[in-house]
Amino acid sequence: MTAIEPQNLEKHTPMMRQYLTLKAQHPDMLLFYRMGDFYELFYEDAKLASELLGISLTARGKSGGDPIPMAGLPYHAVEGYLAKLVQLRVSVAICEQIGDPATSKGPVERKVVRIVTPGTLTDEALLQERQDNLLAALYQGKSGYGYATLDIASGRFVITELANTEALEAELQRTNPAELLYSEDFSQMSLIAGMNGTRRRPEWEFDFDTCQRLLLNQFGTKDLNGFGIEGARLSLQAAGCLMQYVKDTQRTALPHINSIVRFNQTDSIVLDAATRRNLELTVNLQGGHTNTLASVLDSTVTAMGSRMLQRWLHQPLRDHQVIKARQSSIAELIATENYQLLAEDLKALGDVERITARIALRNARPRDFARLRQALGLLPQLQQTLKASSEPHLQYLSQVIGEFPEELALLSRAVVDNPPMLIRDGGVIRDGYDAELDEWRVLSAGATDYLTQLEAREKEQTGISTLKVGYNRVHGYYIEVSRRESDLVPLSYQRRQTLKNTERYIIAELKEHEEKVLSSQGKALALEKQLWEELFDLILPKLHELQEFATAAAELDVLCNFAECAETLNYACPELSDASGIHVEAGRHPVVEQVSQSPFIANPVTLNSQRKMLIVTGPNMGGKSTYMRQIALITLMAHIGCYVPAEHAVIGPVDRIFTRIGASDDLASGRSTFMVEMTETANILHNATPNSLVLMDEIGRGTSTYDGLSLAWSAAEYLANNLNAMTLFATHYFELTQLPEQIKNVENVHLDAVEHGDSIVFMHAVQEGPASRSYGLQVAALAGVPNSVICAAKQKLHHLESRDHALEQSKNGEMAVQQTISFPTQPTSPVIEALEKLNPDELTPRQALDYLYNLKKMAR
């Protein structure tokens, strides 16, 4: 997308000189150059646009002696093309004709009036309705990183200081910016190499004094201490660069960006990049949005509520007071059943958050004002429902939402009921709003009566039966007569146009009327556009209150949504404790239970000061990973204020959640699966604390058995002895089940299965103690591995077991390295085998019923 250097411009045509000059000012963007009813692209821009948009690439004569590659698209279809380019993270500078072709000497004057970049979108047609669209800036200093994000479609401006690359990677994944600005001397390019929408900025744009001055001017303050961001030097440098970029691209005032918030990592539970990925909070492992936690929890009725819910999921809170306020609100909404009534009102509010931003940027469209009017009209009814609640947090939200009777009255007077999409052709301002506009409209509309009278009079005076008065945009008003009666036309008629069967004429009186009508229409449209601009000025003083109303309404939407989830999905309110630990009775995986075809087997977990680590064993496909993930998700849900899928839950303080579950090659960085696994493990061992929840699944698989077992043993030992973190450690290394004998506060649990012949039934119920077998060969058979391979594997297994048994005896019972798996030569009844393993005292009534159904299935 680089521009041709504007050297030797005199060899080009005047129009191309104009184009090349404008292109040189926007070298890293596509330049849409307006020519009549088309936007044209030239040279490399044309080639790239042709490739990306599938439009024809042609040539437009020559300039400077060379053919000019050219591609064009109609101006009325530009939004659709912009949407495609935005999805590809391509920026566009839109150049319009601002001069009058009739009076211009040489090329019509043009200038860039709009810049569209992936991170600065506000147009409804270009934005994902239920996702934040963030512009971010990143600055690297000696002590760490400064990071700033801005959602220009809402005005939300956030900064944070990050100590290391792990924290930066997690923040980049959490925020997922549409566009990222970074300094020329940024050294950790591997962190952002795979991201789209990255944009390199000169070092001087991050100068601290310049950035601070920019922010002070934006907020209209003498210092930044009132925002609680003192000492955040690196992130202020990032914020200043971001602010300059927004000013350069928007080219208008930004009144909705009126504050800045510092996000401290200590305010929320820290989730690293691997944890966000493995827990599939908003994006699944395949990159889609189905079967995620958000897909289960999100029944919000507004887009702004949905976006807030996703932010909550990625930032679970540590402040128990805020969480309890949310819980109390949900309980009240359930008890009164008001969540259903409120949801109906909220559904009609629309996306007030983004509408107010467009009003602030003065690029709102007529229908935005109509939607805002509708939203304001619903507030009395919404407030009536909220007033029935005595819950303090709901009362607070009611107060912030407020009512706007003056703005509602203004919009009701000013804007028609069903306005057109654009102000361009008028028809937006309601009759009766402005007396002068009404006068011009009456004069313009009165033309119809006058023309009818003129036509009747001329017919009578001339005796021409075919005479009629008409109008078109090219020739204006005319009198039309058939060719066979044209000899009856008076001398005062001046011929204007000859057609095949008719002649068209003009008379002085009609010409005078035409000038008056066209003048009145033009003046009416000009005045209407002026009144339209004044409407922005009348609404903007209430901008801050409208933004607060939108934020409070979004939160109310999320809380009503949580109330509905609790009722329809049988969730319970978790108890928040100051004592370290996690206790869950009959917990369920919130996503798996919704997509599973069979009843979900609920399971408990207890982690406390006497029981800090659970060694989880059991067969492949037995449910170990699901069990561990559900504990993490229940913990996370509790810390956003949501009820949880369990009969009862008590959750203590949690500062971090780590997951080391599954891995794949990182080809872009040249890291093997094992290297990725060890990197994630190292991050956990360096950063976990006694209040961290750690999920470790199959550590050490990617290397030799001895290496893998040694690493898994040492990692588990370090977590238990040195870090004392709350840990679930799943493994197929059966030797690890001996850890509870050597380390206090470590216990064994397992998920079992029952084998009958060549079939296997997974019980999915967590029981105390270690598993007896892994059933790897049976799972391989279920997966479709050829029978000959399974048979050969059984023979090899028997050989290895015999060898290990002999070795074990020769070493007087020393721990064997290979996991011992035996197959009974004479299989007993699966029902008897299952009953022998059953401990009825450990089962809940629901688990007992599920167990009974499984026994009946095995007995068939």
UniProtKB/Swiss-Prot annotation:
InterPro entries: DNA_mismatch_repair_MutS, DNA_mismatch_repair_MutS-lik_N, DNA_mismatch_repair_MutS/MSH, DNA_mismatch_repair_MutS_C, DNA_mismatch_repair_MutS_clamp, DNA_mismatch_repair_MutS_core, DNA_mismatch_repair_MutS_N, DNA_mismatch_repair_MutS_sf
CDD domains (UniProt xref): ABC_MutS1 (cd03284)
Entry-linked PROSITE patterns: DNA_MISMATCH_REPAIR_2
Nucleotide-binding as UniProt keyword: yes
GO MF annotation list: ATP binding; ATP-dependent DNA damage sensor activity; damaged DNA binding; mismatched DNA binding
UniProt similarity note: Belongs to the DNA mismatch repair MutS family.
Protein name from the UniProt record: DNA mismatch repair protein MutS
Species this protein is from: Shewanella piezotolerans (strain WP3 / JCM 13877)
Gene: mutS
